[in-house]
């Protein structure tokens, strides 16, 4: 099975078992993984939203079945390149979206997202493969 990276929104939908049918179909047969950024964002949500033991347990259980792409020097270098090129184009990108894109591009993995517009520049200018569509 080939790997596909879930952005934080898709990870959230997957965690709650609420993936849109078209995305669920597109992900069938793939092994899902997330980036270190999504781990951080999910932890932030857990704290800010006051998740109780049940919801925290669901997250821990879900995480056992989803791999995590870690930070490394190649990802850091790619992030710097992506940020610089986007700035030169006059379209600076959010830092966390750039980290997620960098992880995907370094490992040549597609990104599942419901927010195509957030990653469209990375697809157009950097060759990031996107799976998904707009949020339902």
Role assignments for model-derived ranges:
Residues 1-3, 101, 105-136:
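Acidic, PIN/NYN-like endoribonuclease modules and their adjacent C-terminal/linker elements
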Residues 1-35, 44-61, 136:
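Short, well-structured N-terminal submotif of metal-dependent ribonuclease cores
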Residues 62, 95, 119-121:
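Short secondary-structure capping/turn micro-motifs that flank functional sites
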Residues 11-12, 40-43, 69, 120:
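Nucleotide phosphate-binding site architecture
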Residues 16-19, 28, 47-50, 83-84, ...:
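A generic structural signal for secondary-structure junctions
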């Amino acid at each position: 099975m080939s790997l596909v990276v879930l952005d934080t929104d898709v990870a959230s939908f997957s965690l709650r078992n609420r993936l849109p049918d078209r995305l669920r179909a597109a992900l069938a047969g793939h092994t899902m993984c997330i980036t270190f950024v999504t781990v951080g964002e999910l932890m932030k949500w857990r704290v800010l939203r006051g998740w109780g033991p049940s919801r925290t347990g669901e997250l821990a259980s879900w995480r056992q079945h989803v791999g995590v792409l870690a930070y490394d020097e190649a990802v850091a270098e790619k992030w710097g390149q992506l940020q610089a090129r986007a700035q030169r184009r006059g379209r600076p990108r959010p830092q966390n979206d750039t980290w997620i894109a960098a992880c995907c591009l370094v490992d040549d993995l597609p990104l599942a997202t419901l927010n195509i517009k957030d990653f469209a520049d990375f697809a157009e200018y950097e060759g990031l493969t996107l799976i998904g569509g707009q949020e339902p």
